[in-house]
Design a protein with these regions (language model features):
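Paired acidic/hydrophobic, glycine-rich loop segments that form the ligand-binding mouth/hinge
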Residues: 129-134, 140-141
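Short helix-loop capping/hinge motifs at secondary-structure junctions, enriched
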Residues: 26-37, 57, 185-192
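A structural signal for short loop-to-beta-strand junctions that line the ligand-binding cleft
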Residues: 1-27, 62, 159-172
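Short helix-initiation/N-cap motifs at beta->coil->alpha
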Residues: 42-48, 112-125
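Extracytoplasmic/periplasmic substrate-recognition and gating elements
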Residues: 105-111, 147-221
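Glycine-centered hinge/linker elements that transmit conformational signals in sensory
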Residues: 48-53, 86-116, 162
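Short glycine- and hydrophobic/aromatic-rich loop-to-beta-strand nucleating segment
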Residues: 18-22, 77, 179-181
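Extracytoplasmic/periplasmic solute-binding protein
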Residues: 3-13, 18, 45-95, 128
Length: 228
């Protein structure tokens, strides 16, 4: 990551990935009446089928919201062994169709949230009870849901691995933030390098990244310094 023509041009500072967040309090109510199980959310097929069931059970409410619809299709297609892009742009092949169909069915029934804003917002208002979002967004999820009538409820939010397609590769998007440098005076360039070495030292990078909800960028930081 951060390379162009085999040259490192962006120095990584913090990383994140995508995970599934679930309002377990609301899910447990749904489960008690329908038999829905959390392990059904391990696959996209299971998640979208559950979204349809939830919409019917709840009278049209959305079950699921994805923060990054493009990522869903790109990662999903690649996980099924096809290239997402071709020379003309997006390759709308069989794997894309497979990813599209359950997504579209859930959207048509109302089980998939297609509103604007971040995925944290419909979970805070009770308009959805599950979302795929950046691991860094954990700081924006609330343990209190406030609905449109200003009624509040204390809830438990849990995190689960991002779903995969049945028979597909376990694949998930990663992202992060980094720093680019530009040519300057020798003194300023030296100061810049000194600062970056200081910030990316394993233990310090763990403290910096985790305080912001991100993950460290060094293997040493993961293995030795990341809090259990």
């Amino acid at each position: 990551e951060g390379t162009v023509d085999d040259r490192l041009v962006i120095l990584p500072l913090a990383k994140s990935t995508e995970i599934l967040f679930v309002n377990k309090t609301a899910f447990d109510r749904f489960s008690a009446e329908t038999g829905a199980a959390l392990d059904e959310l391990s696959t996209w097929e299971g998640l979208y089928a559950m979204a349809e069931r939830y919409a019917e059970w709840s009278g049209g409410k959305s079950f699921f919201v994805h923060d990054y619809h493009f990522n869903y299709f790109q990662v999903g297609v690649e996980s099924l062994g096809e290239s997402f892009f071709d020379k003309d742009g997006i390759a709308f092949g069989p794997a894309f169709t497979r990813a599209w169909k359950p997504y579209a069915r859930a959207a048509l029934t109302g089980g998939l949230w297609l509103g604007s804003g971040y995925a944290t917002e419909p979970l805070r208002t009770g308009d959805a009870i599950a979302s795929v979002a950046s691991s860094a967004s954990v700081l924006y999820y609330s343990d209190v849901v406030t609905d449109e009538n200003n009624r509040t409820e204390k809830v438990e939010i849990i995190s689960l691995p991002c779903p995969i397609f049945e028979g597909g590769e376990k694949l998930v998007m990663q992202r992060g933030t980094g720093i680019c440098t530009v040519k300057s005076t020798p003194e300023r360039e030296k100061a810049c390098m000194t600062f970056l070495k200081w910030l990316t030292e394993a233990k310090r990078n763990v403290d910096f990244a985790t305080s912001l909800g991100y993950m460290p960028v060094t293997k040493e930081g993961f293995d030795r310094d990341l809090p259990a």
